Amino acid sequence: SIGGTAGVYSLDRMRYGFTMNSGRLTITQSTDTPNGFANSLKVDITTAESSLNASSGAAIGQFIEGQDVQQFKKGTSDAEQYTLSFHVKSSVAGTYPLWFGIYGLSGGSTYYYWTNYTINSADTWEKKVITVKKQYFGIIKHS
């Protein structure tokens, strides 16, 4: 059971960050997957947060090294758009926020990209595809 304020690594490079007072959850590897996959990351809320406030939140993330994203050519005149795709399943259909950050850009800056995605049908695996436009600023360090 996970609760409190922290960030924990769960499964295969996936990190879960959260700020909760009374809420608790478990993270497990599941065999409930979209076609073609062996396992998925499953988050079960075991105790709902009793009082949400402006600092309450949760996020699932994956840290990707700069050497793995050089093909984006971010911050150059040859910058290319890139695509983030993932499968998602939830017991609640609706619109959810998505963001990612690129840390440690040239000059020490950080780039954040914010958008939303929609889960159309509850309890159904759906593939989501997010395309990010070309970015001519902030070269990604090669590390």
Go through each PLM region and give its residues.
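Extracellular and organelle-lumenal recognition/adhesion modules and their flexible linkers in secreted
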Residues: 1-143
